[in-house]
Amino acid sequence: MIETFLSDEYEIFYTTDGSEPTRNSNPYLVPIPMPLGHSVFKFIMYDDDGIASHVATREYDLQLDTPLTIDAAIIMLKQELIKNGSILNVQGQIPGLSAIKDFEIKSAFKQDVEVFYLITEYVVEMDGTRSKSGNHYAINVATNELYRASTNYAGYYMVEAFE
């Protein structure tokens, strides 16, 4: 997780696309899951008077040493969702709707000593509109166990039994 530690006197904003952060950028509210691969974050702070800090740039490179690929993890999730009736097939067709569910793994997180892929669920409408469903899943990269993922009061991801 990417974390910052500051007093409440400051607001922090960040970008991940290489642009300079401003007050209109992503607000830092909770720890950010570590993106897979190479990423560049730019952070800026504003005090109560609106005075900005210098931009801090941080580069991260996360490569997981695991035989579980991202594609295999998503297939495992889809198979479980088919079993419980949430989707009808590996294309993600939702029962009774024309929309489909799509899944994406862009980051990983750690709980205790275990490392998990973080899977975000999207709903894709027939017109191509894609929106987050609010559901998150986690797959342990060492054991291949599937969990539901949620955040606690401090913004850290936690895993819960997948049912």
Give, region by region, the residue ranges found by the protein language model.
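Ordered hydrophobic segments in well-structured contexts
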Residues: 11-14, 42-44, 57, 108, ...
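A short, surface-exposed interaction/processing loop segment used at functional sites
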Residues: 131-163
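Exposed beta-strand-loop-beta-strand "reactive/processing" segments of non-cytosolic proteins
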Residues: 94-142
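Acidic Ser/Thr/Pro-rich low-complexity disordered segments
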Residues: 20-27, 86-94, 127-128
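Short, compositionally stereotyped local motifs that mark structural "simplifiers"
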Residues: 1-68
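...the same signal can extend to comparable exposed beta-sheet modules
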Residues: 25-27, 71, 75, 145, ...
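Secondary-structure transition/turn motif
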Residues: 4-6, 121-124, 150-155
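Short, non-transmembrane alpha-helical segments in secretory-pathway proteins
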Residues: 65-108
